[in-house]
Regions:
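Hydrophobic/aromatic residues within the transmembrane alpha-helices of Major Facilitator Superfamily
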Residues: 20, 24, 57-58, 93, ...
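Cytosolic-biased juxtamembrane loops and peripheral soluble domains of multi-pass membrane proteins
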Residues: 96-125, 176, 183-185
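Short alpha-helical transmembrane interface motifs in multi-pass membrane proteins
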Residues: 13-18, 86-89, 120-124, 155
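Juxtamembrane transmembrane-helix termini in multi-pass membrane transport proteins
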Residues: 2-78, 138-156, 160
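Core segments of transmembrane alpha-helices
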Residues: 85, 128-138, 195-196
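Alpha-helical transmembrane segments and their lipid-water interface positions
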Residues: 29, 55, 59-67, 88-94, ...
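Alpha-helical transmembrane segments of integral membrane proteins, especially early/N-terminal helices
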Residues: 42-52, 113-128
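Selective transmembrane alpha-helices of multi-pass membrane proteins
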Residues: 73-103, 159-160, 164-169, 182-196
């Protein structure tokens, strides 16, 4: 029992629940994942999942070891917010321009984006969304409190990053199922336009 108390803060159940509820609410990362999973299935979306999880992990790391610096540099935070807004507008414009297309339900898609492109798109989506930064700052500081140890913060951060990755991979896997693909093939462009 002592090892659990050493690794997990007393507020960990509340932290885990709050984090999971936040994952359930759709945001830019969710809609990007859905669009990719519909078009490219699991193989064309794994890098996106990894990038989104990495971006979340970086914000958690910032919240743990260096958020005070960013709070003391309002210009830097404003620049991040503006870059985030521009990036989200760009993704939205791509989704708004989506056109009806027939999905390749059998075999691999020839137009699947390279893994590196998926990774950077997911990382950009996650890092340039200022809501992620504010969410993790609020979660790590207010919920865990000042008495939590660095080890407990690190374990909580690793937990949340892992949950983001597992959730995103599960979502993409479910959307990539052939039965779901058949249902979504006629409306993929509408989903993308709505997301945009």
């Amino acid at each position: 029992m002592d090892i659990l108390a050493t690794l997990f803060p007393s507020a960990f159940p509340a932290l885990a629940l709050s984090h999971f509820v936040a994952l359930l609410s759709p945001g830019p990362d969710f809609f990007l994942l859905v669009g990719y999973a519909i078009r490219y299935r699991l193989r064309g979306s794994v890098g996106l999942c990894l990038g989104i999880a990495a971006g979340n992990g970086l914000y958690i790391l910032l919240a743990i070891i260096g958020w005070g610096i960013l709070r003391q540099a309002p210009l830097l935070f404003t620049v991040i917010e503006l870059l985030g807004a521009a990036y989200l507008l760009w993704i939205g414009s791509l989704l708004l321009r989506s056109r009806p297309a027939t999905l390749a339900l059998h075999g691999a898609s020839a137009s699947r984006p390279p893994l590196v492109k998926q990774l950077f798109l997911g990382l950009g989506s996650s890092l340039l969304n200022p809501k992620n930064a504010l969410f993790y700052l609020a979660l790590m500081t207010s919920l865990l409190g000042p008495n939590v140890t660095l080890v407990q913060q690190a374990v909580s951060g690793a937990w949340m990053t892992s949950v983001v990755l597992i959730w995103d991979l599960l979502l993409v896997t479910l959307i990539a199922l052939p039965s779901v693909q058949r249902r979504l093939s006629a409306v993929v462009w509408r989903v993308e336009r709505t997301a945009g």
